[in-house]
Every structure is written in structure tokens, then in C-alpha cells.
Amino acid sequence: MEIGDRVQTLNTFVPITGEIVDMYKNLVTIADDDAETVDQLLSFPADDLEVIS
């Protein structure tokens, strides 16, 4: 996983998708594709995400 990759959450009822905008150790911050607010950033442990094409 690298900044700019598209990812989605694993093991969730409705997958959350977005683009990686920041990474720090095991914490990955993405810009949520379906955010309904101005602040579209969400953070997840890297193990909870998978890269998609």
C-alpha cells in the first residue's frame, strides 16, 4: 500500500472505499468516496484495508 492507492475496508457490511492520502506506521488515512460531510478523511489500521483497482 502506498499514498495514492485505492483501497476498501475488509470485513464490513458495506465496504468503505477511497484513496490513501496519508500513512503513519500502521495507520492509513483515506479520502472517503461517499462522504456526506466536508471532512471526508477516515483512518483505519492497515490490516483492515485491501488495495483495489
Stretch-by-stretch model annotation:
Residues 1-11:
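Short coil-to-beta transition motif at edge beta-strands of beta-rich domains
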Residues 2, 22-23, 51:
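Generic beta-strand structural signal
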Residues 6, 17, 41-43:
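Well-ordered beta-strand positions in beta-sheet-rich domains
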Residues 11-13, 34:
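A generic beta-sheet turn/junction motif
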Residues 14-23:
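Short beta-strand-centered aromatic/proline hotspots
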Residues 20, 31-32:
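Residue-level recognition of conserved beta-strand positions in structured domain cores
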Residues 26-29:
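Short aromatic-glycine-enriched beta-strand elements
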Residues 33-53:
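Intrinsically disordered, low-complexity, charged/polar segments
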